């Protein structure tokens, strides 16, 4: 993934100026008026918004100051029916800081109706800035901004979305920014378009006119804004007209832990009626029921699927918890220490923080033992990394919050045993064959219980699920340990005191199916914690302290990544309304919200909130595809080794 570049913005006569491209970000004659003339009128958006019944999708090259987005959003909120939604996808390779963004918008929007919207955008703007996709639900949920930070062509190639309705081709002029306006970029614009997708751009350059014209866009040259003589607008006149998407109105979610609750929330807040079925007598009764947990990203020497997914998941978690009710879920201030507990991790930290793809200090920064102890509030053994965005949360409370939305029906104490598909609907049946619920689609979020379900699939995709035992210890706070300010992570973790006790976690035991508390494992957890934080060395009073613990079983996959996507029949690989979100492992707090959003986006036909390469790494069929690829490679090697005859 490409690195983000510093725009090195300057301010000239009160306007933001790019010394890299030697031009201002918006017109001196009036930024909002320019947006309205070039992009809104150029795409005839006011009249199109008024006719929109469902979702209108816009793609933009060059987010810049966010001015185009805000002026467009204001017009949409004014002109579109209340039932309509706007999905605005914008790419930016040189993103402004939040400070510069605010200054630019404060300057540009004086006296304009969109000024009232700028505060919400600024508050939600990513900080610190990292490469990747960043989804933001704004303005009462009617507008979704999907911000793609990175090189434009690369980011668009990662975008998985239904065809867009219109394009804002902004960015600096081709003469000043020739790398942007490439044939590869135009091909991505074409890929993400359908017949009658429109575009508008301030530029009338031949490279734009020819690049789009060769791909089937009808081009019209028309009057530009203010002193600019010409601009271009047009539409795609080839290809197929996309079929109207009819998202399901109802869904069944099986599983009442973090994963199922997240899917429920993501569907319900988009208007889907959800029936959530849980076998236990309460939500979050099993692995999601820990009283406290730590949401922390993974740091790797180079960006990997795992590290990028944890960054995306943590960003989404911050957005989710910024909504009403989120304050009650968060314990203390953000931040966590991760100590380098062996040479391998120390080398990994070193490369991840100081290499060419180094993360910004606001996200992760190295700390020596003295700095680590100061951050922790007590003495810790060794240095490591401080993650400023990490969170300590109440998982059970988060699960309950996610299922509190309107349109959610809870069925507790019901076990789904069999799934049927009849007349285009999914049915969930219990062991006696009684129908528990029916809906247009069904999501399995019941961890390893997926393996016990009877499904109407002729050749179901094999899911290599692994059941992993985890035991954590509740350690009563003492006078010294109570000073711990942030969680300390190593190959385990210690949380600050909550309700008079710390949580020390957690074992990760494959193939151990014992559900009883193991005192020896409690002792090992305690000894390991004391080795990193001496304040935890005292042995608690009482002979039964090792039994102040909790055991639960996580579900993970063979490659330690979640399994999220459409669950297809290998005999009929068309999507049939059956989906899965499971195998979150020990990272349920980080992954569950992201998996829930991705599942809802797949079901409802929305632009995906993570890169296509990441969503592909989560698909249920990935294990089968890898096995086929491995077998083909083995056959090829065998063929090459075969001796020649004759």
Question: Where do the PLM segments sit?
Answer:
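Short beta-strand to alpha-helix junction loop
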Residues: 200, 304-313, 343-345, 384-400, ...
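A conserved short coil-to-beta-strand element within the FAD-binding core of flavoproteins
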Residues: 412-426
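S-adenosyl-L-methionine
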Residues: 104-158
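Helix-loop-beta segment of a Rossmann-like dinucleotide-binding subdomain
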Residues: 112-113, 117, 301-302, 327-338, ...
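Rossmann-like AdoMet
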Residues: 1-56, 73-110, 621
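C-terminal catalytic lobe of FAD-dependent flavoproteins
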Residues: 539-646
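Dinucleotide-binding Rossmann-like beta1-alpha1 core, especially the glycine-rich loop
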Residues: 292-375
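Active-site substrate-recognition segment that forms the wall
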Residues: 239-270, 279, 287-294, 299, ...
């Amino acid at each position: 993934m490409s690195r983000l570049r510093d725009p090195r913005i300057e301010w000239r006569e009160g306007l933001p100026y790019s010394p890299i491209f030697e031009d201002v970000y918006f017109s001196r004659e009036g930024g909002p008026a320019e947006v309205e003339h070039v992009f809104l009128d150029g795409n005839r958006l006011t009249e199109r918004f008024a006719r929109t019944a469902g979702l209108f999708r816009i793609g933009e090259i060059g987010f810049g100051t966010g001015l185009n987005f805000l002026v467009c959003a204001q017009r949409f909120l004014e002109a579109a029916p209340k039932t309509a939604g706007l999905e605005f996808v914008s790419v930016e390779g040189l993103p402004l800081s939040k400070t510069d963004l605010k200054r630019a918008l404060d300057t540009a929007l004086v006296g304009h109706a969109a000024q009232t919207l700028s505060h919400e955008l600024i508050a939600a703007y990513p900080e610190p800035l990292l490469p990747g996709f960043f989804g933001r639900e704004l303005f009462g949920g009617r507008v979704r901004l999907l911000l793609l930070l990175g090189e434009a062509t690369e980011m668009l190639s990662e975008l998985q979305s239904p065809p867009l309705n219109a394009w804002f081709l902004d960015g600096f002029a081709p003469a000043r920014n020739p790398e942007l306006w490439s044939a590869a970029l135009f091909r991505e614009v074409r890929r993400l378009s359908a017949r009658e997708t429109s575009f508008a751009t301030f530029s009338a350059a031949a490279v734009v006119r020819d690049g789009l014209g060769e791909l089937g866009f009808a081009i019209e040259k028309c009057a530009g804004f203010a002193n600019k003589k010409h601009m271009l607008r047009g539409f795609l006149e080839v290809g197929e007209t996309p079929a109207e998407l009819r998202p399901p109105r109802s869904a069944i979610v099986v599983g009442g832990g973090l994963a199922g609750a997240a899917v429920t929330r993501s569907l319900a807040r988009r208007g889907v009626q959800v029936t959530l079925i849980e076998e236990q007598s309460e939500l979050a009764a099993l692995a999601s029921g820990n009283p406290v947990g730590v949401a922390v990203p993974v740091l790797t020497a180079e960006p990997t699927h795992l590290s990028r997914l944890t960054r995306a998941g943590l960003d989404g978690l911050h957005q989710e918890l910024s909504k009403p009710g989120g304050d009650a879920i968060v314990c203390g201030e953000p931040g966590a220490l991760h100590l380098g507990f062996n040479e391998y991790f120390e080398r990994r930290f070193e490369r991840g923080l100081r290499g060419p793809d180094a993360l910004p200090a606001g996200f992760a920064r190295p700390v020596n033992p003295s700095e680590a102890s100061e951050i922790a509030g007590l003495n810790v053994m060794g240095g490591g990394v401080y993650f400023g965005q990490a969170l300590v949360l109440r998982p059970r409370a988060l699960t309950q919050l996610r299922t509190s939305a309107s349109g959610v029906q809870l069925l507790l104490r019901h076990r789904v045993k069999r799934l049927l598909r009849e007349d285009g609907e999914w049915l969930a049946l219990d062991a006696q064959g009684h129908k528990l619920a029916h809906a247009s689609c069904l999501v399995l979020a019941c961890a390893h219980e997926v393996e016990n379900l009877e499904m109407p699939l002729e050749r179901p995709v094999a899911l290599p699920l692994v059941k992993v035992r985890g035991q954590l210890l509740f350690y009563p706070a003492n006078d010294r340990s109570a000073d711990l300010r942030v969680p300390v992570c190593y190959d385990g973790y210690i949380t600050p005191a909550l309700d008079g006790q710390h949580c020390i976690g957690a074992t990760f035991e494959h193939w151990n199916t014992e559900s009883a508390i193991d005192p020896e494992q409690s002792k090992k957890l305690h000894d390991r914690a004391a080795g990193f934080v001496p304040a935890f060395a005292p042995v608690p009073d009482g002979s039964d302290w090792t039994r102040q613990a909790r055991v639960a079983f996580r579900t993970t996959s063979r490659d330690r990544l979640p399994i999220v996507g459409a669950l297809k029949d290998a005999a009929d690989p068309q999507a049939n309304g059956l989906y899965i979100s499971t195998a979150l492992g020990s990272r349920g707090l980080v992954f569950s919200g992201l998996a829930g959003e991705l599942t809802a986006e797949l079901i409802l036909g929305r632009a995906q909130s993570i890169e296509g390469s990441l969503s592909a790494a989560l698909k249920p069929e990935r294990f089968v595809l890898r096995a086929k690829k491995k077998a083909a490679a083995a056959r090829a090697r065998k063929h090459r080794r075969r001796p020649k005859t004759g």
